[in-house]
């Protein structure tokens, strides 16, 4: 959550510092991508596999299989 606040603060600072403010959505996009990559890297190998399976299924329009854990 702290990283999310950091991204928001940095985006606001860049929005104020950039003389031509028409590029602030591009900066926001890159900060969000960095945040997603950071969160992905925190996952272990099994969670990464499930993450990509879920993402690819959603992007291709196929129904997402329900994962049932019998722990």
From Swiss-Prot:
Superkingdom: Viruses
Spans within the Extracellular topological domain: 39-69
Keywords assigned: Glycoprotein, Host membrane, Membrane, Transmembrane, Transmembrane helix
GO cellular component: host cell membrane; membrane
Subcellular location(s) of the protein: Host membrane
Membrane disposition: Single-pass membrane protein
Glycosylation, residue list: 53
Topology feature Cytoplasmic, residues: 1-16
Family designation: Belongs to the asfivirus X69R family.
Designated name of the protein: Uncharacterized membrane protein X69R
Species for this entry: African swine fever virus (isolate Pig/Kenya/KEN-50/1950) (ASFV)
